């Protein structure tokens, strides 16, 4: 009986860890999307889009942010997949 208790405790601990990882990844995506929105709003300001140097810098940052979002989404998909796999096992 003690072995079963330990196993259940370990399963719950692992499940919490997987859930936390998934939640952190979602928060990361939300944060990056907010930053992207701010950059796009900044780019739409006349003094920014009318200045080729500023405009190019902001465009580069937007591209970087979009890449970060893609990477973060891949990490979230991995975390969500691991959680789903765990839930299917138990």
Summary of predicted features, one role per range:
Residues 1-90:
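Charged, heptad-repeat coiled-coil alpha-helices that serve as long linker/dimerization "arms"
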